[in-house]
Amino acid sequence: MRTQFVVTSIWLLGLWATSMSVSAMPQAYVTNEKDNTLSIIDMNTFEVTDTLDIGERPRGFILSADQAHAYICASDSDRIQIIDLDTHTIVGDLPSGEDPETIALHPNGTTIYTANEDDALLTVIDIPTSQVIAQIDVGVEPEGLAVSHDGRMMVVTSETTNMVHWIDTNTHENIANSLVDARPRDAHFTADDKYLWVSSEIGGTVTLFDTQTKQKVHTLSFAVKGVYRDKIQPVGILLMKNSPYAFVALGPANRVAVVNTNTFEVEKYIVVGRRVWQLAFNQDQSLLLTTNGVSGDVSVINTETLDVEKTIKVGRYPWGIAVKWK
C-alpha cells in the first residue's frame, strides 16, 4: 500500500506540475475581427495552439491585473466578454453599452473603461459588481483609451471630432479637450505620466502633449521611401520602459516606425505584414508583436536587433493583441 501511495503521489505531483506549467506558459492572444475568433499563440514555439469562437466583431482586448482573465470588446454583440485563460472558455459578460470598440483597465484592477463608437460615450464599468458606474459624453467616434500610471487621469481620443478628452477618474468629468491631427487612434502615457503620445491616422502624425498643461509640445511625422504619404497612417503606439525606443504602427504603410524618444528621430522602419494595427510586448520587452489586418498574421520583432524574427498566421483581420506571462 505504501508503494502504491508513493507512486500515486508522484503521478499526481507530475500532473499538477504539468498543469501549472501549461497555465503559466507565456501565450499571446489575438482577436480576429472578421472570423469572430480568438487565436492563442504559444510564445515558446510561436505557433497557434487554439482558436476560440467568441462574440461578433471582436476588437479591443485586455488582460485582468492577475492575468487570469481576458476582457474582449465584442463590438457587434454589444458586450464585453470575459474569458477564463486557464480553461479558454467564456465565463461571463460585462455591460458595455452599444458597439464597444476599445478597452482599458485602471491600475486598481477593478475598473474598466470602454469606448462606445456609435454613441460618442465613454462607459465606466465596475468589474466585481458587473455594473456600469458612469457614462461620459465625449466626441464623435471615440476610440483610443489610456489610463495614467498613477490612476488619476484617463484620456479618450475621438476620431471625427479630432480631439483628446481628458477625464478625471475620481469625478468621471471631462476636464479638458485638446485638438489633434485628423482621426486620432491610439494614446499612451509615458512611464512618469508627464507626457501623452497620440497617433493620428489620417493626419499621419504622432503628437506629444504635456499632461499638466494639456498642450502640444511636439509633433512627429513619418516618411517612408517608396510609400505614398496617404498610406502612412499611424495607429498603435508602445513605449519601452528601459530603452529610448517608441514603436508606432503605420497601418497600410506596412511598417513599424522605431522612434528615439530622446531625439524624436525615426531610427528605422521595420517591414511587417499588411495594414499593421496594434502592438504588444512580451514580459521583458525583448519581443514586440504586431497585428497585421489585411495579411491576417502577427509579426514578431526582436526589439534589440529591430528585425522580424517570425510571422504567425492567425485569423482574418487580426485587431487586438495581448501577451500573458503569469
Question: How would you label these PLM feature ranges?
Answer:
Residues 4, 14, 20-326:
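Predominantly soluble domains enriched in secretory-pathway, periplasmic, or organellar proteins
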